Amino acid sequence: MADSPSEGFLGTAYDLETGEQTLDHYQRWAGTYDQEVGVDNGYAQPARCAAALARVASSCDHVLDVGCGTGLSGVALRDAGFTRLDGCDFSPPMLERAAETGVYRRLFEADLNTGLGTDDAYDHAVAVGVFSFGHIRPDALREVLRVVRAGGAVVVGVNDHFWEVGELPAELDAIEADGLASVASREHGEHLPGAAIMGWVIVLVRSGN
C-alpha cells in the first residue's frame, strides 16, 4: 500500500491477511508497540474514541475495551474519566503489557471472531483499531453488540485504509437494516498523524429495551 508507514512492525501491519499472521505479528510487536505507535507516530484514535464515548456515557458505566492491545485505549478511557474497565485481546504478550497500565479491573484472552462473552454483560464497548486487515472480520461487530446492553454504545475507531475497502461501511448499513443498532455519529479525523493516516470514529447505539 503506497501510503502505508514503512518503519518497524507498523510498516507491515497493513499487509496481514490471516489470523495466524496477525497473532504472530502482534506477539512480536508487544514490547515496542507503545513506542512505535503511541510515541513515534502520535496514535490519536484512543483519545478520540474515549472522547466519543464520554459524550454518550457515564463515567461509572462498565466498559469493555475490545482488542485492548497494550492498553493505550484503556489509558485514554481512564483519562476521560472511566473507571470500570475490562479489556480483552487475543495476544497474551499484549495483555501482559496492558496489565502493567493498572487501568483494567479484568483482562482476558478472547478471539472476537469466535466469541466474546455473556449477553448484555457491559454498558458499552470500544474497539480501537481492531477492525483492519488480517485482524477481525467486519461482521464480528455483531458480537461486540451482543455483549452490550440495549441502549449501550459501541465506539469503533478504524483507519482510512480499511474503511475505504468498503466492507465495514457495508456491515454498518446491514446492522442498521437488521434493526440491531443505529449509527449515532461518524467523525473523520486523525488516526496516526505521524504516519499521515486519517481515520473514522463511529458510535453505534444498540437497539432494544
Feature annotation, model-predicted:
Residues 139-150:
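A short glycine-rich, Lys/Arg-flanked "PGG" loop and its adjoining helix->strand segment in the class I
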Residues 151-159:
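Conserved beta-strand signature within the Rossmann-like core of class I S-adenosyl-L-methionine
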Residues 64-66, 70-115:
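Class I SAM-dependent methyltransferase SAM/SAH-binding core
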Residues 1-32:
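N-terminal, positively charged/glycine-rich alpha-helical extensions of SAM-dependent methyltransferases
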Residues 124-137:
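A short SAM/SAH-binding and catalytic strip from SAM-dependent methyltransferases
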Residues 194-209:
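Core SAM-dependent methyltransferase catalytic element
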Residues 34-50:
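Conserved SAM-binding loop and adjacent beta-strand
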